[in-house]
Amino acid sequence: MRAFWGALPTEGRWLLSTVAIQTLGRGLTLPFTLIYLHEVRGFDLGLSGTLMALIAVVGFLVTGPGGALTDRYGARAVLLTGTAAMIAGNVLLAFATTPALAAVALVLVGFNFGVSWPGFNALIASVVSGDLRQQYFGINFALVNLGIGVGGVVGGLFADVSRPDTFTTIFLADAASGLIPMALLLGPLRHVHGRAAAPADGSPAPAAVGYLTILREPAVRWLTLLTFIGTFIGYGQHEAGFPGFARQAAEVSTRTIGLAFAVNTAIIVVLQFAVLSRISGRRRTRVMLVMAATWAVAWALLGLAGLAPGGLAAATGVIAFMGVFALGETLLQPTVPAMSNDLASDHTRGRYNALTAAAFQGGAIAGPVVAGFLLQHDLSVVYIALMVLGCAAIALVALVLERHVSATVNGQQTEPAAVGEGTPS
């Protein structure tokens, strides 16, 4: 860790040192927004769920334009706009007494999600490169989980449905957490815009390179597909499929589910650094194979929990699922973003990251829909089988992807990683 920190440029240190604090605000509200809309503001459950879906839908719709704007105007400008929308959205949500006002607030929050992913990843990639970039994405992921995990615990202890003002407070705190990245972007990082004004090799200017052109690259298509499948069977199941199976098939308590999420966060935070040292210099596609196998084991454990519902074995299986799944997450997060940014050139980085983000959001939307349908029709065995088949599909796609990327893009470094200082405006 000391060597990594020493290799980072000043801009990278600024970005990384505040990640956990920034995401703590999101953790305060993420698990409780639906509860707030339904139990505090009195919106019926169906309407509350529809309002929540606005975040994902709007995020998906603006990801493409967000990537193009990142390449045209720079990651810094896009992130400032997205963060301002997030702050406004959370302030509105804190006082949203009508569905219309809540809808406007959640659209603003969704807009931020949609434009921030390609923007933030592009900003990181403008600061660090090579194996250092892969390490950065992994450590950033661990810190994000730490912030959200701690925020969730604090929010759970503080929020009380019988005291609406406690929910107002946590949404205002989430808004306030957005002031940290804004201060960084307007202060120490004001010269890092994350934009290449013109490609040095004479290739088409940013406006001439569209998404269809990028998708004609086989490596991009396969990486996008892998990201979609990985999200569909992974994060797309965290908020619906996993809790639904745990309650319906395994018949465990909500406390057990909460403990499982806590174990998931703890393992990511504790193991991410060790995992990064083990995968450094190894082919990223082979790391994805290990991830697929790890997730297959995790889903099998959850399936076994459903065979002995309501007891200690079921609770153990549910918690073990999230623990083993976390190990797979530590393999996924450093590899896919790093590979996407290594495929991109400086003037297309925003759009490459936008494609990855769109695939992620597509999987996050489709995952709960499919899980809800299968579990509603008591097809829990089919559900687990589909998840395991998804793991096999990831392995197959990773092997195909390997044939379409260079050794450098696949994480094999022949020289020490270079460190960029960012592009001055």
Residues covered by each model-derived region:
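Juxtamembrane intracellular "pre-TM" segments in multi-pass secondary transporters
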Residues: M1-E11, R190-I229, E415-P424
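Helix-loop boundary and gating motifs at the non-cytosolic
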Residues: G6-A56, V220-A262
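Residue-level signature of mid-helix packing/kink "hotspots" within the transmembrane helices
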Residues: A56-G64, G149, T265-F273, A364-I365
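Helix-to-loop junctions at the C-terminal end of transmembrane segments
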Residues: V62-G74, A159, V270-T285, L375
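Structural signature of the two symmetry-related core transmembrane helices
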Residues: A77-L92, R286-L301
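Cytoplasmic helix-loop-helix junction between adjacent transmembrane helices
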Residues: A105-L146
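C-terminal membrane-cytosol helix-exit motif in multi-pass small-molecule transporters
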Residues: G156, A176-A197, L396-E402
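A membrane-interface helix-boundary motif in multi-pass transporters
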Residues: D160-A176, F373-A392
